[in-house]
C-alpha cells in the first residue's frame, strides 16, 4: 500500500512538473516576448523626437550612439603598428592612445583555427576599451593635448620590443610634448611623457593615466559580471602611505560589474604612493602602474555618456611646476595582457626569481601585490598552494587533467591518517547496524533510553559516529579552492584532457540528449525547449560517472537511522549529477577520481573488518553465475 502511495505521489510530481514547464514555454514565454516587443516599440516611438544625427535606437528603445565597425573605428585615426611576440595591433595618433590590441598567444575558442583574443578596441566601436595618458592643466591652463589632438610621428615606425616609437605635439603656445612608447616581449608598455616649456612663463600641470571601457558586454560567452565566483571590474592595489592603514597597500575591489554602477559609481581621491590601478576580466587585465615613488589619487568611476555607461579606472599624479626653459618627464607603465601567474609574479618582483613556498625569502615588491589581479578567493591560503602544486605536476606530465588526478592522490595521501580513522569508524558502524536497528525497535517509545543505549554501544565498540563527517568537511574548502583555480586561472583555459575534453575550465561538452554525439543533433536547436535541453539537462559522460561513483560511495556508508533521511541520501547522487553537470569538467574529474580512491580505501577497510559491502556482493553474484554456468 505504501509503495502504491509513493508511486502515485511520484507520478503526480512528474505530471505537475511537465505541466509547469509546458505552460512556461508555450504560454508564459510567448506572452512575455510580446510584452517586451510592445514596450520596445513604445519606447522607440517616444524616443524618435530625441534622435540626433549620429544616433540610433537601441534594443531597449532608447537613443544611443551609432556604433562603428572595428575597422571603421580604426580608420578614424592614422596609426602606428604594434608587433611583439605576444601582441599585435596599433596605436592611434589621434589622442596618442593605445586602443587596438590582440593577444597572439590566446585564441577565442579551443579551436586551433580560432582568431586571437581581442583586448583593446577603438573608441566608436561597440564596447570600446583603451588606455589614455596625458597632462591635466592646473588653474585653468589651456593648450594641452586632448583626445582629439593628432600627434606626429616619423613615417614607417613600428612598435617592437627593440624599437620604441616617438610621438610629438607642439601646441604653438610654447609647450612641446613628446611621448616615447616602448614595450617588452610580453605585456608591459612603458609610456614616457616629456614636456618642454619654450615659453616665457612658468606653467603647472599634473600627469594622469586612464583605462576606459565604453559599455561592457553582458551576454554571450564574453559577457561580464554574470557570476559571483569571479571578480570582474575596476581593480587596484593602493596605499603605502605612512600613518594610513599602517602604511599597507590595500586591494581595491569594490567596483565589480554590474554593482559598480549601482552601489559605488564614483570612488575618488584614493590616495596612494605608487601602487597600480586598472580593470580586469576573468582572464585579462589592463593595469596602470605609476612611478612607485610618486603620490597619486586613484579613481573608479562609471557615468552615462550619450546613452552608454562609461567605466573608468584612472589616477592623477602630483602637480608639477615647469619653469620657462625647463623640461619635466613622467613615466607610466601599462600592463595589457593575460593574467598568467608567473608573468604577474615576475613583474611584481622586478624579474627576480621567486620560489613560491619560500615566503620568508621574497624579494622586494616592484609593483605592490600585482599577483592580486588574480581572484584567489577567500581560501587563498589553500587556493594558491593548490595551483602551485598543479603547475608542478603539469610540468611533470604535460596535461592538466592528469595533474588534477595526481593532485587528488597527493591530497588523499596527506589526509590518509585522518580519513583512515574516519572510514574505519564508518565500517564499524555499518557492521553494528543490525544491533542499532534492534535497539531502535526495542526502545521505540523511549527516545532518551534509545539514545543512551546507542551511545553505550558506540563506546563499547570504540566508535565515534561523528568521524564519518570529517573527510567531507575537510574537502569543502579544497573543493572550493580547486573550483577557483579552474575558474579564474588562465592556465586552465582551453587546457585539454583526453578524448572529447578540450577545455578543463568548461563543462563536459557531451550530453546524453544526443547519445553523447552518436546522433548528430544539437539539443540547443530544439524549438521552445532548446535552452532547457542544453542547460539543466545537458549531462555529459563525466557527470554520469561522478553520479555512479557517488552512489557507490553512499552504498558503502552505514545507512541513516531515519527512513526519510535514507530516501534523501538515495536522491543525492541524482541531484549532484545534475548540479555538477554545469561545473567545469576539471572539477568533475577531480571529484570522480576522488570518489574512486575513497571507494577503494573504504573497500580495503571493510574487507579487513569483514563488513558486507556492494563490491563483495557484486563479486559473489558474478562467482555464483560462473559456478551455475559450469
UniProtKB/Swiss-Prot annotation:
Record-annotated membrane-spanning stretches: 10-30, 396-416, 470-490, 528-548, 571-591
Q: Where in the cell is it found?
A: Cell inner membrane
For membrane topology, the record states: Multi-pass membrane protein
Q: Which GO terms describe its cellular component?
A: plasma membrane
* Highest taxon, organism lineage: Bacteria
Alphabetically sorted, this entry's keywords are: Cell inner membrane, Cell membrane, Chaperone, Membrane, Protein transport, Transmembrane, Transmembrane helix, Transport
Q: Name one Pfam family in it.
A: YidC_periplas
Q: Which GO terms describe its molecular function?
A: membrane insertase activity
One of the GO BP terms on file: protein transport
Q: What does this protein do?
A: Required for the insertion and/or proper folding and/or complex formation of integral membrane proteins into the membrane. Involved in integration of membrane proteins that insert both dependently and independently of the Sec translocase complex, as well as at least some lipoproteins. Aids folding of multispanning membrane proteins.
Q: Which family does it belong to?
A: Belongs to the OXA1/ALB3/YidC family. Type 1 subfamily.
Q: Can you state the subunit structure given in the record?
A: Interacts with the Sec translocase complex via SecD. Specifically interacts with transmembrane segments of nascent integral membrane proteins during membrane integration.
The protein's name: Membrane protein insertase YidC
Amino acid at each position: 500500500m505504501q509503495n502504491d502511495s509513493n508511486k502515485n505521489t511520484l507520478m503526480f510530481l512528474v505530471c505537475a512538473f511537465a505541466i509547469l514547464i509546458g505552460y512556461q514555454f508555450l504560454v508564459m514565454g510567448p506572452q512575455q516576448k510580446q510584452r517586451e516587443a510592445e514596450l520596445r516599440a513604445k519606447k522607440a516611438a517616444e524616443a524618435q523626437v530625441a534622435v540626433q544625427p549620429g544616433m540610433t535606437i537601441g534594443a531597449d528603445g532608447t537613443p544611443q550612439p551609432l556604433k562603428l565597425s572595428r575597422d571603421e573605428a580604426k580608420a578614424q585615426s592614422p596609426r602606428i603598428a604594434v608587433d611583439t611576440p605576444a601582441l599585435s595591433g596599433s596605436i592611434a595618433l589621434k589622442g596618442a592612445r593605445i586602443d587596438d590590441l590582440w593577444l597572439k598567444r590566446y585564441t577565442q575558442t579551443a579551436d586551433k583555427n580560432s582568431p586571437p583574443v581581442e583586448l583593446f578596441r577603438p573608441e566608436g566601436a561597440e564596447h570600446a576599451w583603451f588606455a589614455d595618458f596625458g597632462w591635466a592643466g592646473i588653474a585653468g591652463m589651456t593648450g594641452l593635448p586632448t583626445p582629439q589632438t593628432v600627434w606626429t610621428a616619423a613615417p614607417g615606425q613600428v612598435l617592437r620590443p627593440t624599437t620604441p616609437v616617438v610621438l610629438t605635439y607642439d601646441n604653438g603656445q610654447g609647450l612641446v610634448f613628446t611621448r616615447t612608447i616602448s614595450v617588452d616581449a610580453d605585456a608591459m608598455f612603458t609610456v614616457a611623457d616629456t614636456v618642454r616649456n619654450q615659453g616665457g612663463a612658468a606653467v603647472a600641470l599634473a600627469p594622469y593615466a586612464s583605462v576606459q571601457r565604453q559599455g561592457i558586454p553582458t551576454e554571450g560567452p564574453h559577457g561580464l559580471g554574470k557570476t559571483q565566483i569571479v571578480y570582474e571590474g575596476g581593480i587596484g592595489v593602493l596605499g603605502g602611505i605612512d600613518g594610513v592603514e599602517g602604511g599597507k597597500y590595500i586591494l581595491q575591489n569594490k567596483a565589480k560589474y554590474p554593482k559598480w554602477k549601482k552601489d559605488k559609481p564614483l570612488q575618488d581621491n584614493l590616495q596612494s604612493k605608487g601602487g597600480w590601478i586598472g580593470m580586469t576580466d576573468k582572464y585579462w587585465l589592463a593595469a596602470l602602474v605609476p612611478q612607485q615613488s610618486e603620490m597619486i589619487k586613484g579613481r573608479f568611476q562609471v557615468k552615462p555618456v550619450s546613452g552608454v555607461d562609461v567605466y573608468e579606472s584612472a589616477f592623477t599624479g602630483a602637480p608639477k611646476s615647469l619653469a620657462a626653459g625647463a623640461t619635466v618627464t613622467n613615466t607610466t607603465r601599462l600592463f595589457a595582457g593575460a593574467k598568467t601567474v608567473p608573468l604577474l609574479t615576475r613583474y611584481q618582483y622586478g624579474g627576480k626569481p621567486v620560489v613560491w613556498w619560500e615566503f620568508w625569502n621574497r624579494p622586494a615588491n616592484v609593483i605592490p601585490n600585482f599577483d592580486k589581479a588574480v581572484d584567489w578567493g577567500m581560501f587563498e591560503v589553500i587556493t594558491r598552494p593548490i595551483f602551485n602544486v598543479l603547475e608542478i605536476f603539469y610540468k611533470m606530465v604535460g596535461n592538466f587533467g592528469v595533474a588534477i588526478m595526481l593532485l587528488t592522490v597527493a591530497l588523499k595521501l596527506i589526509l590518509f591518517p585522518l580519513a583512515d580513522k574516519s572510514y574505519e569508524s564508518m565500517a564499524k558502524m555499518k557492521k553494528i547496524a543490525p544491533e542499532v536497528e534492534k535497539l531502535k525497535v526495542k526502545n521505540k517509545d523511549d527516545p532518551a533510553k534509545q539514545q543512551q543505549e546507542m551511545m553505550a554501544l558506540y563506546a563499547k565498540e570504540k566508535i565515534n559516529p561523528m568521524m564519518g563527517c570529517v573527510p567531507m568537511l575537510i574537502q569543502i574548502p579544497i573543493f572550493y579552492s580547486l573550483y577557483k583555480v579552474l575558474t579564474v586561472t588562465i592556465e586552465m583555459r582551453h587546457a585539454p584532457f583526453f578524448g572529447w575534453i578540450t577545455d578543463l575550465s568548461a563543462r563536459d561538452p557531451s550530453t546524453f540528449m544526443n547519445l553523447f554525439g552518436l546522433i548528430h543533433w544539437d539539443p540547443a536547436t530544439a524549438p521552445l525547449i532548446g535552452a532547457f535541453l542544453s542547460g539543466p539537462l545537458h549531462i555529459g559522460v563525466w557527470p554520469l560517472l561522478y553520479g555512479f561513483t557517488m552512489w557507490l560511495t553512499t552504498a558503502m556508508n552505514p545507512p541513516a537511522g531515519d527512513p526519510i533521511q535514507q530516501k534523501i541520501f538515495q536522491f543525492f547522487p541524482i541531484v549532484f549529477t545534475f548540479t555538477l553537470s554545469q561545473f567545469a569538467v576539471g572539477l568533475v574529474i577531480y571529484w570522480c577520481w576522488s570518489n574512486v580512491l575513497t571507494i577503494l580505501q573504504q573497500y580495503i577497510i571493510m574487507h579487513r573488518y569483514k563488513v558486507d559491502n556492494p563490491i563483495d556482493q557484486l563479486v559473489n553474484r558474478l562467482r555464483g553465475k560462473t559456478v551455475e554456468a559450469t
